[in-house]
């Protein structure tokens, strides 16, 4: 009896050591858009995604930003387009209106829209792309040209999925080949 109790205690302790104490339910990959701006004007500017649905989830604190540049982004609301970060989305969206240290703008999380326009607001005024862009891949990289006010380059679905396929196929074949050689 004592032996069974000791075995049970050891099993319970092992289970407690192996099982994590906290669970991370939201740890999977999230869709993302990275935008590189070329030919940008000198000085501070903001870049945001314009979406067709107004939202009630505040994605930024307006007190941290220049009100004049924010107003340039919000002026598109009269045309039925709403700034995703500056105006809010129905679900959370992460990003920043200012460029990151590497000069890119990154938007991610569940609030990332499938179709959007790019809007920029700078010291000389605001502008937005004429046509909406529709994401076709999970991680999208865009190049936005300030002078032409257009998206000049986007991630190719064939290239993206081709690289993803090869990056999983080659290691899988190498591991399976190694196992076949070892146990063959």
Regions found by a protein language model. Give the residues of each.
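Core alpha-helical transmembrane segments of integral membrane proteins
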Residues: 160-184
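Short, aromatic-rich amphipathic segments at membrane interfaces
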Residues: 128-165
